[in-house]
Amino acid sequence: TVGNNVIMWAGNHIGHHSIIEDHCFFTSHVCMSGHCHIGSHAYLGVNATIRDFGEIAEGTFVSMDTSITKNITEPWGIYRGSPARRLKNVE
C-alpha cells in the first residue's frame, strides 16, 4: 500500500505486503523486502536497503548506502551506515 504524496525515483524494489505512509520520498535503487512499514515523512537515500518486516518511524532520514537491519522506532532521526546507526535528530 502506498500513501498520498509519495515520490519514488526509478529503480526501486518494494516487497510484497509493504506499507508506505503519506509524504515519503524514495530516491533511486531503494530495496525493501516484504512486509515493511515506512512511517510518514520518511526519506530513503540511494541504495538504502531494508530487511523483511522492517519498520521505519515517522520522519526518519536514511542516508545513501545504509542497511536497515533493525527496526527504527524513534521518530525524526538521521541514520547512516551498515548496519544503520542514529547520527542525530532531525530539527
Question: Where do the model's predicted regions map?
Answer:
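Histidine/lysine/aspartate-rich catalytic loop segments that bind and position anionic ligands
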Residues: T1-T27, S33
